[in-house]
Regions:
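Conserved phosphate-handling catalytic cores of large alpha/beta enzymes
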Residues: 147-188
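Pre-Walker A adenine-sensing motif
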Residues: 9-23
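An amphipathic, basic-hydrophobic helix/alpha-beta surface used to engage anionic
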Residues: 37-44, 48-57, 120-121, 140, ...
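Loop/turn-to-beta-strand initiation segments
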Residues: 56, 104-107, 133-142
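Structural recognition of the conserved hydrophobic beta-strand(s) that form the central parallel beta-sheet
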Residues: 108-110, 139-146, 175, 182
Length: 188
């Protein structure tokens, strides 16, 4: 049996990779089967819970909701200003990645993981913004629905008849530190 012998450089690279992983933030995804099941609500409730335990929590971007209970949960959280821009005569409000990196909280809330950013943003997709936050050592809570996962998109579309264009690579979901399923009881 041949023994594989690694060079000292190989081991140094492995040690450096481990150091980077130790400094990387953790991703928690609030995962649902459809819009309106309460993902943002659950994320905000969890944020208030960890804040009570002394964690520095900031709302980076929360999708505006017509649900009063969800909107009320933003109260008591520091909210970063959105990045506002004009595009084709429309005013767009986006997650402000630079403000988040400058503030550098322990935990940031960023709704809608699969969102496609406006052209003024550094990254095309919100999951890329979140990746940058994680690499900066910031923990992230976010939300996503099953149909936005690349490998499940076609299957969900064949059942629902609805094709979504905003998707995340499976690797983003697979690399999450924690996934919390959020669902509601079917109506009788």
């Amino acid at each position: 049996m041949d023994e594989i012998r690694h060079s000292p450089e190989h081991f140094l690279k492995e040690i450096e990779k481990e150091k980077q992983n130790l400094n990387r933030g953790h991703l928690k995804i609030f995962f649902g089967y459809a819009a309106g099941v309460g993902k943002t609500y659950a994320m905000l409730k969890a944020a208030h819970s960890v804040k009570r335990h002394g964690i520095d929590v900031v709302a980076g971007y929360i999708e505006p909701h017509a649900r009063l209970q969800t909107s009320a949960l933003v109260n008591g959280l520091e909210c970063l200003p959105n990045l506002v821009s004009e595009y084709n005569g429309i005013t767009l409000s986006e997650f402000n990645l630079d403000a988040a990196l400058a503030r550098h909280p322990q935990l940031i809330l960023v709704d809608e993981l699969a969102h496609t950013n406006a052209p003024v943003c550094r990254h095309t997709k919100r999951y890329q913004d979140i990746e940058e936050l994680l690499n900066a050592g910031i923990d992230v809570y976010t939300t996503v629905n099953v149909q936005h996962i690349e490998s499940l998109n076609d299957t969900v579309a064949s059942i629902t008849g609805i094709m979504v264009h905003e998707r995340i690579p499976d690797s983003v979901f697979d690399n999450a530190s924690q996934v919390e399923l959020v669902d509601i009881e079917p109506q009788e």
